[in-house]
Regions:
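Start-of-domain marker
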Residues: 31-94
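Short amphipathic beta-strand segments in non-cytosolic proteins
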Residues: 70-79, 202-218
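Short acidic/polar inter-strand loop motif in beta-rich domains
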Residues: 110-118, 244-249
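N-terminal secretory signal peptides that target proteins for export/translocation
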Residues: 1-9
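A short, solvent-exposed beta-strand micro-motif common in secreted/extracellular proteins
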Residues: 104-108, 235-243
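Beta-strand-rich domain onsets/edges
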Residues: 31-46, 125-187, 192-197, 209-211, ...
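Bacterial N-terminal signal peptides
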Residues: 15-24
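Glycine-centered loop-to-beta-strand initiation motif
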Residues: 88-91, 219-234
């Protein structure tokens, strides 16, 4: 019994320090990289979901941390149910779901602070996200600081069931139809900010199979809507990023030169 306890304790300590190591070093290097939710099929009795951090749809799964979470909830037919998770959960989110429904799991992080190591990294980030006007107003004699927040969703279903989600996050991508319904050739979505459509805005579409990866950039229509053609064998990640100067209240709280909000939406049309 003592040997078993010692082995368990050693494994727990190793896992604990591994999570600290990953969080520390990745946070120093990623420069506000994308966060998304990705289905993990390791557990049979529950639906398990990884919190992934990386770029170009390649990332590292993180254990769950309540200190980093602002909101985590399941939305079915606009009925919201908070999801409670334990610190250190790995996979991060473990929940019992009825796949006959159209399930939307929503995760909002707290703000994280970042100071850039060099000006070029900030400029490249701004250019990539198509905020070129920032290049003419930022202070190039000072290393920029930034607070970033992520708003991430994953769609999970094994049926044609669908509902249109009402806006519940400050920055989000909302599904306008179901990617699991085979009669829908295109997946339609809407980008929202504080409950209002965000038109003429850049959205990056990532998709992948085990063999290949694809990326394209589109812009939403003036009404905030967009659409993409979907294929059953690909996993999809839609991403939108907004960079802006903090207002007076935000500046008092966040104390950074810039703020960025990241919205992501993932789904795999052939879950079933």
């Amino acid at each position: 019994m003592t040997i078993f306890k010692n082995r368990f304790f050693k494994k727990y300590i190793i896992f604990f320090f591994l999570i600290i190591f990953l969080n520390f070093f990745l946070n120093k290097e990623i420069v506000a990289h994308e966060l998304w939710l990705e289905k993990n099929s390791n557990l049979k009795d529950k639906t398990s979901i990884d919190i992934m951090i990386g770029q170009n749809f390649k990332g590292t799964p993180y254990g769950f941390s309540n200190d980093e979470k602002e909101k985590l909830f399941l939305d079915n037919n606009n009925i919201v149910k908070d999801i409670k998770q334990r610190d250190g959960n790995f996979p991060a989110i473990q929940i019992e779901l009825n796949d006959n429904y159209f399930n939307i799991i929503n995760y909002e992080s707290k703000y994280s602070f970042l100071e850039y190591d060099n000006i070029k990294t900030f400029e490249d980030f701004v250019k990539e996200q198509n905020f070129l006007d920032i290049l003419s107003i930022y202070n190039s004699n000072k290393l920029p600081t930034e607070n970033y927040k992520r708003f991430s969703k994953i769609l999970i279903s094994n049926s044609k069931d669908f509902f249109q989600q009402t806006s519940k996050l400050d920055f989000e991508l909302i599904a306008l139809n179901s990617p699991f319904d085979k009669s829908n050739v295109f997946f339609k979505f809407k980008l929202m900010e504080e409950g209002k459509p965000l038109g003429n805005f850049q959205v990056t579409i990532f998709s992948k199979t085990k063999e290949n990866f694809a990326q394209e950039t589109i812009k939403t229509k003036p009404n905030g809507e967009g659409k993409i053609r979907v294929f059953d064998d690909r996993v999809y990640l839609l991403s939108a990023v907004k960079i802006f100067k903090p207002n007076f209240i935000q500046n008092l709280e966040l104390k950074s030169d810039w703020v960025s909000h990241w919205a992501s939406l993932t789904f795999f049309p052939s879950y079933n």
